[in-house]
Amino acid sequence: VTQNQEVNITGLSLTIKPSRSSNLVWVQGFISHNCDSNQQAHFFVSRNGTNISPIGDAGGGNQKRAFVSAQGNQDYMGNWVVKNTPFWFMDTPATTSTVTYQVGAIMGVTNSQYLWINRSQRDTSGTGYDMRAVSNITAWEVSG
């Protein structure tokens, strides 16, 4: 993954069609992940291709919108730990058209970084600590 590039995470998306344009959409989920040592993984959610992560706007023209940041092996305690990062927020799509929510990642330190989803970096078979995991995104309409 190239530094500061927004990349969609395959399989972590959904569509919902609000019945009224005044209704809200509650979006929640979690990401199971591991990344290279001394690297940073930032996660975001987009609506119809636009990053709508609910934490702070970009400042100074160079920061990305992201809802969580994780340090590489400093945070993961090694290349065998799978971290689980939850997210949740209320969105106001203001439409009755189909809306697609997509989870993505931004790597933040150097180019050629690796981010593993639902597994560890090492991913060694037959050990008691290299687990496989799942990630999830769920949304439901809330009357507004």
Q: PLM features: residue spans?
A:
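Extracellular/luminal regions of secreted and cell-surface proteins that mediate adhesion/ECM remodeling
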Residues: 1-18
